[in-house]
């Protein structure tokens, strides 16, 4: 079940697509906040991989809405590479600094004003609440 709010007769297809991208960032932000609250550890950086990392708008919005830096590696899919490096580090073939120091990354830093971030996030929470209470 889902909900689209704030649509009018003039809402364009691109705005709906952007809303879908925004939802990815909001959901990840919800998870990051829950992890931080449960662990008591502030999360200041996300290291991400996968297909959505190609979308610069999404990566910047993720950084803005979660108020953390987002690090995107030059390699798109790192799950397999990460497993291989972890095994190599555990076996003493690689050292941690050698592996992680070599990876080039694009960094996205939060640029959104705090009041705008809070307004957008509260709008997200209200939309989620609407779905949950219907």
Residue ranges of each PLM-predicted region?
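Glycine/Thr-rich phosphate-binding loops that ligate phosphate moieties of nucleotide
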Residues: 1-134
């Amino acid at each position: 079940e889902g909900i689209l709010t704030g649509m009018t007769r003039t809402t364009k297809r691109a705005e709906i697509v952007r809303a879908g991208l925004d939802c990815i960032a909001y959901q990840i932000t919800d998870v990051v906040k829950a992890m931080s609250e449960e662990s008591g550890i502030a999360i200041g950086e996300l290291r991400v991989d996968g297909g959505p990392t190609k979308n610069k708008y999404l990566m910047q919005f993720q950084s803005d809405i979660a108020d953390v830096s987002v690090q995107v590696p030059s390699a798109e899919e790192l799950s397999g590479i990460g497993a291989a490096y972890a095994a190599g580090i555990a076996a003493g073939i690689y050292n941690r600094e050698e592996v992680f120091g070599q990876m080039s990354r694009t960094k996205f830093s939060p640029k959104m004003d705090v009041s705008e971030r809070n307004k957008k996030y509260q709008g997200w929470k209200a939309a989620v609440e609407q779905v949950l209470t219907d």
